[in-house]
Curated annotation (Swiss-Prot):
A Pfam family matched in the record: RapZ-like_N
Similarity-based family: Belongs to the RapZ-like family.
Presence of keyword Nucleotide-binding: yes
GO molecular function: ATP binding; GTP binding
Residue positions binding ATP: G8, V9, S10, G11, S12, G13, K14, S15
Function comment: Displays ATPase and GTPase activities.
The protein's name: Nucleotide-binding protein Noc_2797
HAMAP family per record: RapZ_like (MF_00636)
Binding-site positions, GTP: D58, A59, R60, N61
Keywords: ATP-binding, GTP-binding, Nucleotide-binding
InterPro entries for this protein: P-loop_NTPase, RapZ-like, RapZ-like_N, RapZ_C
């Protein structure tokens, strides 16, 4: 049996993630007390109909129970239940904006909101440290998050590690959820060609421009060589998720092109390869 544990700071999209999995026929429970996790896991093992489940855990648990999470997780794993932990987060500025827009009450509402966000992140630290997959929802809409959850988690019947290539722009910040970050700002920039400026790295004119430069080809080959060497080692350690972020200045041309090229190359080698362009969304 596989059990997904969805956690994260308030406002990061935990409920959306659970609803996305529920739509994929997962059995979902939100805000289950941590001390009930072993009981729930044993019950699910006895019910052959429920082989995929997702549990939402957040700061509404008592602090002492949150601190016991690593021990409880070990108990569940010893019982033969394979757990995947997904932790959602976002920048403080984004979380403050979301609470302002929705006017919802924070679980730690007895203190100022900015302080509550920091305290909650600290309370959930024991869960975040155990996360198999961290998702930064700072620049992600509701619909994009639902799609991302469905693609990375909802299709776990397919074997192998889920590999995501993500392009981004440094001027908008580095993704918080990346395992590898590669800076390609040293490559020729199509932005300085007026006819290419409004296009993206997926357009044929930009692709042709970048393919003409030997430095771009060399960077692409170096990334492939590096990743081919190390991806199998990550997979051999039973790693379920890996995110490779490629960054250029604006996240529109060079990083998009290379993310697409890497996806095309590794798609033939791995069953679960995805590509996301943060700044084009």
């Amino acid at each position: 049996m596989k059990l997904h544990i969805i956690s994260g700071v308030s406002g990061s999209g935990k409920s959306i993630a659970l609803h996305a999995l529920e739509d994929r026929d997962y059995y979902c429970i939100d805000n289950l007390p941590i001390y009930l996790l072993p009981t729930f896991a044993k019950r699910m093992q006895r019910d052959a109909r429920q082989l995929r489940a997702a549990i939402g855990i957040d700061a509404r648990n008592l602090p002492q129970e949150l601190r016991q999470f690593p021990q409880i997780l070990e108990e569940i794993e010893r019982a033969g239940v394979h757990c995947h932990i997904i932790f959602l987060d976002a920048s403080d500025t984004t979380l403050l904006k979301r609470f302002s827009e929705t006017r919802r009450k924070h679980p730690l509402s007895h203190i100022p909101l900015a302080e509550a966000i920091h305290c909650e992140r600290a309370l959930l630290g024991t869960i975040a440290e155990k996360a198999d997959l961290r998702i930064d929802t700072t620049c992600t809409t509701i619909h994009q998050l639902r799609d991302l959850i469905s693609e990375r988690i909802g299709d776990d019947a397919r074997p192998g590690m889920s590999l995501l290539f993500q392009s981004f722009g440094y001027k908008h910040g580095v993704p918080l959820d990346a395992d590898f970050v590669f800076d390609v700002r040293c490559l020729p920039n199509p932005h300085w060609e007026p006819h290419l400026r409004p296009l993206s790295g997926r357009d044929s004119e930009v692709i042709a421009y970048l393919k003409r430069h030997e430095t771009v080809t060399q960077m692409q080959q170096d990334l492939i060589t590096f990743l081919q060497h190390w991806l199998q080692r990550f997979q051999n350690t039973n790693r379920s998720y890996l995110t490779v972020a490629i960054g250029c200045t604006g996240g529109q041309h060079r990083s998009v092109y290379l993310a697409e090229q890497l996806k095309a190359h590794f798609h033939s080698l791995h069953a679960r390869v995805l590509c996301r362009h943060r700044e084009l969304s």
